[in-house]
Curated annotation (Swiss-Prot):
Family matches, as Gene3D superfamilies: Phosphoribosyl-AMP cyclohydrolase
Pathway membership, UniProt: Amino-acid biosynthesis; L-histidine biosynthesis; L-histidine from 5-phospho-alpha-D-ribose 1-diphosphate: step 3/9
Residue positions binding Mg(2+): 77, 79, 81
Gene designation: hisI
Example GO biological process: L-histidine biosynthetic process
Compartment list: Cytoplasm
Lineage: Bacteria, Pseudomonadati, Pseudomonadota, Gammaproteobacteria, Pseudomonadales
Source organism, top-level taxon: Bacteria
Native species: Pseudomonas putida (strain W619)
Predominant location category: cytoplasm
Name of the protein in question: Phosphoribosyl-AMP cyclohydrolase
EC number, as in UniProt: 3.5.4.19
Reactions catalysed according to its record: 1-(5-phospho-beta-D-ribosyl)-5'-AMP + H2O = 1-(5-phospho-beta-D-ribosyl)-5-[(5-phospho-beta-D-ribosylamino)methylideneamino]imidazole-4-carboxamide
Coiled-coil ranges per UniProt: none
Length: 130
């Protein structure tokens, strides 16, 4: 039934890293973890659903913020141990900091520099609860 899930090399915790990329620009938006259930649900619902290690439960991206990731394509790398999700990022914000991407810092001159702006105040996104 779900033999395709057996092709994935899950880590010792039953997880696989998943990289979300903008399906139009190719920009890396974020990295999160998926388990068998979240990956199967992602395929079935055509939206990104991750496994929250800190909360120990499924995390439907956008369930609190409204910043849903609509799935356009899934890819598995050559070693079968990393997933790429090509997504449409609703609201153009993937990061809980209110930025387009979680990768908003660049290493320059021996330090990490913030180079991407906050598009929306996280307190406004999460009703001051994040």
């Amino acid at each position: 039934m779900k033999e395709w899930l057996d092709e994935i090399k899950w880590n010792s915790d039953g997880l696989v890293p998943a990289i979300a990329q903008d399906h139009k620009t190719g920009r890396v938006l974020m990295m999160a973890w998926m388990n068998r259930e979240s990956l199967a649900l992602t395929a079935a619902e055509q939206r990104a659903i991750y496994w929250s290690r800190s909360r120990g439960k499924l995390w439907r991206k956008g369930e609190e913020s409204g910043h849903v990731q609509k799935l356009h394509e899934m890819r598995l790398d050559c070693d079968a141990d990393v997933i790429i999700l090509m997504v449409e990022q609703l609201g153009h914000i993937a990061c809980h900091t209110g930025r387009e991407s979680c990768f908003y810092r660049v290493f320059e001159d021996g330090q990490w520099k913030t180079v991407d702006p906050v598009l929306k105040d996280p307190d406004a996104i999460y009703n001051a609860g994040h």
